[in-house]
């Protein structure tokens, strides 16, 4: 059917971490075509992740989105890659800032741990050795204001064609007619480059500004088709003043100027960074530098909107929320008919309390927030990572915290009280399998 599309999005129970899988499909002439994606794949407890992975029946992912490279969000990638083919990975660009954060987080008394060091030295090869065919880096917002919404695909005049950039279009190849075509485009893009690994050729490129993955009935479809399903990643900025202070402090430790641009870090800089972190005093000094930006080493983080590019009237949306949880897991559960949206918005560990990150984040997603049915609270339900200004813009959405049951402050009791006062639904996805949470929607004309 040209006039309908279905989606099933599931947050699997992996404890203190995250593992979301989405299926987007269309059925026409008794044939079904689908697109599959995941958001994050890790947990502090590896057994919890593997149990959640066992519950996932997929054999192939078109795209794996990674919010950031903290272990509890990505340490399950080897287990994931051993179970299913991962075609493409989208993650925050490993610029100088990201590389320093990852190196500091992955260092111990002997320096940077082997797997992290290998990833830093050649991230494209690292993913390629796990069977990934393409690696797409999304640059951190450097404007501090959020992308210009006039360039956003969903904001074009109804009958105008999509703004064209080189991008990458992925059509169904011979023998893969069951896959839906999709494309990834950005406001600004690097040239496509390739490297050779033992598993084959891997291509990579960097996208900046407004970035969107479009799952379409036809790769050349106009944006006026309301059933184009979009996956919109966004990596929030830091304030320029704070970045400048950090760069000066880090430059003193590394004894060379630290660039704060959003492009891929050079191998030369990475080599010096790894060598510096072998020294205990330098390691402590560099970690202290990062505290200028973040006290918990969780930034920057990629968020992901998954839903239609155009607003749809509620009568054109069919919902099915599935959870094995009893009423004790819910707070102010809304009747199903009051859930007005059909989209899912994941946030990783984004700091949506700070005005410096919240304002551009809201600017990027504001036109899509009315469509959000499920909102994943940042940083496992941390009270200091979310502002009421964000929560109040999605009053009917279900708020979800991905957190293990034994964590005292995830979700934080103060956040639960705030949600109570706002009259909003809340559910926790823990390591307990009945807490797995799914949203299925069908959009029809």
Role assignments for model-derived ranges:
Residues 45-91, 366-384, 395-399:
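Active-site metal-binding motif and surrounding structural segment of the metallo-beta-lactamase
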Residues 51-53, 103-111, 118-127, 360-362, ...:
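Short, aromatic/basic amphipathic alpha-helical patches
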Residues 74-126, 396-400:
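Active-site HxH/HxHxD metal-binding segment of metal-dependent hydrolases
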Residues 69-74, 96-98, 143-144, 351-355, ...:
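Active-site environment of divalent metal-dependent phosphoester hydrolases
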Residues 378, 382-394, 402-445:
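C-terminal regions of proteins
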Residues 1-59, 128-132, 136-370, 436, ...:
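Core dinuclear metal-dependent hydrolase active-site scaffold
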Residues 84, 131, 394-395, 423:
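A structural signal for short coil/turn segments at secondary-structure junctions
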């Amino acid at each position: 059917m040209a006039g309908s599309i279905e989606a099933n999005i599931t947050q699997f129970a992996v404890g203190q971490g995250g593992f979301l899988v989405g299926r987007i499909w269309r059925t026409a002439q008794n044939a079904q075509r689908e697109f599959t994606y995941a958001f994050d794949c890790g947990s502090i407890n590896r057994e919890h992740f593997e149990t959640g992975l066992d519950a996932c029946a997929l054999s192939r992912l078109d795209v794996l989105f990674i919010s950031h490279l903290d272990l509890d969000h990505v340490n399950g990638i080897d287990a994931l890659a051993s179970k299913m083919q991962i075609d493409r990975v989208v993650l925050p660009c490993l610029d100088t800032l990201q590389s320093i954060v990852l190196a500091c987080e992955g260092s111990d008394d002997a320096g940077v741990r082997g797997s992290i060091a290998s990833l830093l030295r050649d991230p494209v090869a690292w993913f390629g050795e796990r069977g990934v065919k393409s690696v797409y880096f999304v640059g951190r917002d450097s404007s501090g204001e959020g992308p210009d919404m006039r360039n956003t695909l969903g904001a074009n005049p109804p009958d105008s064609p999509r703004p064209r950039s080189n991008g990458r279009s992925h059509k169904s190849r011979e023998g893969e007619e069951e896959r839906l075509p999709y494309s990834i485009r950005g406001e600004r893009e690097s040239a496509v480059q390739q490297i050779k690994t033992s598993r084959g050729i891997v291509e990579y490129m960097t996208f900046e500004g407004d970035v969107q993955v479009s799952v379409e009935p036809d790769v050349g479809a106009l944006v006026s088709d309301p059933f184009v399903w979009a996956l919109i990643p966004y990596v929030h900025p830091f304030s320029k003043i704070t970045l400048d202070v950090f760069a000066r402090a880090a430059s003193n430790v590394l004894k060379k100027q630290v660039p704060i641009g959003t492009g891929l870090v050079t191998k030369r800089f990475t080599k010096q960074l790894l060598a510096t972190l072998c020294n205990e005093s330098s390691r402590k000094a560099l970690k202290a530098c990062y505290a200028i930006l973040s006290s918990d080493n969780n930034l920057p983080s990629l968020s992901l909107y998954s839903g239609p590019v155009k607003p749809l009237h509620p009568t054109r949306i069919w919902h099915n929320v599935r959870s094995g949880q009893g009423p004790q897991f819910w707070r102010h559960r809304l009747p199903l008919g009051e859930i007005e949206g059909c989209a899912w918005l994941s946030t990783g560990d984004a700091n949506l309390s700070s005005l410096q990150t919240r304002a551009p984040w809201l600017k990027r997603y504001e036109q899509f927030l009315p469509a959000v049915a499920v909102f994943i609270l940042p940083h496992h339900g941390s009270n200091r990572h979310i502002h009421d200004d964000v929560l109040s813009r999605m009053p009917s959405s279900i708020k979800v915290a991905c957190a293990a049951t034994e964590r005292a402050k995830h979700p934080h009791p103060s956040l639960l009280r705030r949600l109570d006062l706002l009259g909003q639904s809340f559910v926790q996805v823990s390591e307990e399998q009945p807490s797995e949470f799914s949203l299925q929607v069908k959009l029809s004309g």
